[in-house]
Swiss-Prot record:
This is ATP-dependent Clp protease adapter protein ClpS. Gene3D superfamilies: 3.30.1390.10. It comes from Janthinobacterium sp. (strain Marseille). Coiled coil: none annotated. InterPro entries: ClpS, ClpS_core, Ribosomal_bL12_C/ClpS-like. One of its GO terms (biological process) is proteolysis. Involved in the modulation of the specificity of the ClpAP-mediated ATP-dependent protein degradation.
Length: 102
């Protein structure tokens, strides 16, 4: 689409093709020290999981060594990782939380 001004200048509107943001999955990693109930609490508080879903993810972390908490744009995933790590440290647990590009 072109816009012509009185002074003769012509502005051309250039179509922008926006791609969706890169998505990242947030993972909890298993360790031998963090209580299972604390992992369930983290999943409920920071990932809005109901108790049953949080328990299923916690069991996956325990059984498989890691569990997916959710998939988010980079900034949100990064913030969630930081919040979980800070909460775990303050509670004295070595729980690890990481993000991976999907």
């Amino acid at each position: 689409m072109a816009i012509k001004h009185d002074d003769g200048t012509v502005l051309m509107r250039q179509e922008q093709k926006l791609k969706p943001p890169s998505m990242y999955q947030v993972l909890l990693l298993n360790d031998d020290y963090t209580p299972m109930e604390f992992v369930v609490l983290i999943l409920q508080e920071y990932f809005s999981k109901d108790r049953e879903t949080a328990t299923q993810i916690m069991l996956m972390v325990h059984r498989d060594g890691k569990g997916i908490c959710g998939v988010y744009p980079k900034d949100i995933a990064s913030t969630k990782v930081e919040l979980v790590l800070n909460h775990a440290r303050k509670a004295g647990h070595p729980l690890q939380c990481v993000m991976e590009e999907v």
